[in-house]
Amino acid sequence: MASAPNANGDAAVSDYDLMLKLAQNLDRHMIFPLLEFSAGQLVDEESGVVRDEAKAREITQAKYSLLKNSNMTDYVANLYCELAGVEEPPAEFADKKQKVFSQLQNLEQQTSKIIELLEREDVVNNLRSDKVANLEFLKREHQVTMDMVNALFDLGNLQYSCGNYGDASEMLYRFRVLSTDNDKVAFATWGRLACEILTMNWESAMEELVKVRETIDTKLSQNPLAQLQHRTALTHWALFPLFNFEKAREPILELFFNAGYINTIQANCPWILRYLAVAVITNRGRAKNPGIHQKQMKDVVRIVKQEAYEYQDPITRFVHALAIDFDFEEAQRQLVLAEEVLRSDFFLLAHADDFVDSARHLIFESYCKIHARISLKDLSARLGLNADAAEKWIVNLIRDTRLDAKIDYKEGTVVMNHPPSSVYQQVIEKTKGGFFRTQVLTAAIAK
């Protein structure tokens, strides 16, 4: 669970930092951008001065520990010099660099023939969807060996370890086209997903994400523990496209609300609720199907309520206060804290303003459902705005959403038009609901 509140009832923003929890489920190369973000948070925007030298050094040490076993030799050597206060790194760094260079040369020689073949149109035109047949064709006509194919895999891994993600992606793709080793193919697919994320090639990342999901669902169906672990990892990796690529929003939300993944979140990583709640709340007005968005919002509320004993932060507490407790004062208080948390979160910083605006819409909608006449002064307090800003915000909302409401400037109120629902209309709505449920039951019995 998130840190307990302090004496004033609030926890410090740093207490809601999810870095350690996220890092446990990310590849080391994916953790690096999060550390870079944390380092950037310590720099004063106006002066460029680092506010906390001790914390900055701690982050530099974390970068070094993270990457020292990678093959990013030059960068790791620079980190060492920064930490040790020296100008030249020890000879071991140069030795490792030479060793890595030799490995790259060796693997490039081993793969040069097969790469050349895969770039020839006459060869590619003879390849089919049957990998076994493709290998037989290449062995027979071009003397390709399995060692050559596996060398593509090794070269892709080495390029990745060096931080050459584009080259690594290409090698792993070529390997996957030819290999019949299911375990290595699965590993290569995860590798390509990582590469596409790190190069911010979001469309390709989404294609690889779908492939990884299919592998988890099919290949691991008889191994529940492994399936849980892989789904946990994929859930964390999916945060990168979710908050950086607009077209990824709906398919990834569909993934997260899939029974297998929502169970994974609840059982293994409840902190993902922060990201799920933000994604759903900020999706208002964007969702292609408003009905699906409403269902997702209800599901978020339900899960936040169920998992309150396991995980809480200002974002989930905002949802709880507004949609479960109907405590508007607490919702506004948590919204202020939530904005601070979002601005210190790697994935959510760019969505902080959008979240606050969407959250205010939710507060306004909820408040209007139970009041016919609302004081502008009272509403401005609920929204966390001054009187003028609140009035402007409400005017824009009424105009943009065609809300059936008007502002009474003389009385300083917002007047809501809640047309009474006739008994006849209520009976019709209930009959429709009963008829639909009967259809669902009939269909279920027929199956």
Curated annotation (Swiss-Prot):
One of its GO terms (biological process) is formation of cytoplasmic translation initiation complex. Residues 253-421 form the PCI domain. GO terms for cellular component: eukaryotic 43S preinitiation complex; eukaryotic 48S preinitiation complex; eukaryotic translation initiation factor 3 complex, eIF3e. The keyword Transmembrane helix does not apply. It is found in: Cytoplasm. One of its GO terms (molecular function) is translation initiation factor activity. Keywords: Cytoplasm, Initiation factor, Protein biosynthesis. The keyword Protein biosynthesis applies. Disulfide bonds: none annotated. PROSITE patterns: PCI (PS50250). Its main location: cytoplasm. It comes from the Eukaryota. SUPFAM superfamilies: Winged helix' DNA-binding domain. Coiled coil: none annotated. Belongs to the eIF-3 subunit E family. Component of the eukaryotic translation initiation factor 3 (eIF-3) complex, which is involved in protein synthesis of a specialized repertoire of mRNAs and, together with other initiation factors, stimulates binding of mRNA and methionyl-tRNAi to the 40S ribosome. The eIF-3 complex specifically targets and initiates translation of a subset of mRNAs involved in cell proliferation. Component of the eukaryotic translation initiation factor 3 (eIF-3) complex. PANTHER family: EUKARYOTIC TRANSLATION INITIATION FACTOR 3 SUBUNIT E. This is Eukaryotic translation initiation factor 3 subunit E. It comes from Chaetomium globosum (strain ATCC 6205 / CBS 148.51 / DSM 1962 / NBRC 6347 / NRRL 1970) (Soil fungus).
